[in-house]
Structure formats: C-alpha cells, structure tokens
C-alpha cells in the first residue's frame, strides 16, 4: 500500500468518526432534553405553589438567577 493511500484512509476515517460522533452526541442531547426539560419560570411557579408558597415575580426572578449562577460555575 502506498504511503499516500494510507494517509488518505486515515484522514477519511478520522473525518467519518468525528461526523458520526457529532450526530450521535446530538441525538443523545436531544433525547435527554426531551426527557428532562430545563426548568423555566412557569415550572418554578408551579413548584412553589405545590410547596404552599405564594410565588411572587420577585421570588421567581431570584430563584432563576440563583439557578443560572449555579449552572455557570
């Protein structure tokens, strides 16, 4: 096998592996987000109501900002 053919096969295999890995990771993340959607303000309001708290917009904003700060760490 000539040297250039070996290099070409290696590069093609590498590109194919990267592309396949990207699509597998994308599919996994889409399924994960479908099963576990991120918490939004409406969900937070419902959780507070279920816990017996009266959800004010100020409390919801404080909790959302605290959750966003925690995620960025």
Curated annotation (Swiss-Prot):
What are the cysteine partners in each disulfide bond?
none
Q: Does the keyword NADP apply?
A: no
Question: Membrane topology for this entry?
Answer: Single-pass membrane protein
TM annotation in the entry: 4-24
Its keywords, alphabetically, are: Cell membrane, Membrane, Transmembrane, Transmembrane helix
Q: Where in the cell is it found?
A: Cell membrane
Question: Key word Zinc-finger present in the record?
Answer: no
InterPro entries recorded for this chain?
UPF0154 (IPR005359)
Q: Pfam families this protein is in? A: UPF0154
Single GO cellular component annotation?
Answer: plasma membrane
Xref: NCBIfam families: PRK01844.1 (NF002503)
Q: Which family does it belong to?
A: Belongs to the UPF0154 family.
Name under which the protein is recorded:
UPF0154 protein BcerKBAB4_3367
């Amino acid at each position: 096998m000539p040297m250039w053919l070996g290099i070409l096969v290696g590069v093609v295999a590498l590109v194919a592996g990267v592309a396949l890995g990207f699509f597998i990771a994308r599919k996994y993340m889409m399924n994960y987000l479908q099963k576990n959607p991120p918490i939004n303000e409406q969900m937070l309001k419902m959780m507070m109501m279920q816990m017996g708290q009266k959800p004010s917009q100020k409390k919801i904003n404080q909790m959302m900002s605290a959750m966003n700060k925690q995620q960025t760490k």
